[in-house]
Swiss-Prot record:
Site positions (Reactive bond): 17-18
Principal subcellular localisation of the protein: secreted
TM annotation in the entry: none
UniProt xrefs under InterPro entries: Kunitz_BPTI, Kunitz_BPTI_sf, Prtase_inh_Kunz-CS, TFPI/VKTCI-like
MF annotations from Gene Ontology: serine-type endopeptidase inhibitor activity
Cystine residue pairs: 7-57, 16-40, 32-53
Domain BPTI/Kunitz inhibitor: 7-57
Organism: Bos taurus (Bovine)
Protein name: Serum basic protease inhibitor
Amino acid sequence: TERPDFCLEPPYTGPCKAAMIRYFYNAKAGFCETFVYGGCRAKSNNFKSAEDCMRTCGGA
C-alpha cells in the first residue's frame, strides 16, 4: 500500500506552548521520530504513538 502524502510533511510544532511529545514519520530516515508539539493546529503527520505512526506511514 502507498503511504499518504502527509507522511512526507515535516513535523509542525504549532503556535501553542503545551510541549507534548508526539511522533512524526521521517521520510528520509524511513521511520518515526519524536518531536515537540505545542498542542494546537496539528498537521496530519502527528501521532500519539510510534505504533500509530508506523501503521499509517511506515508500511509502504
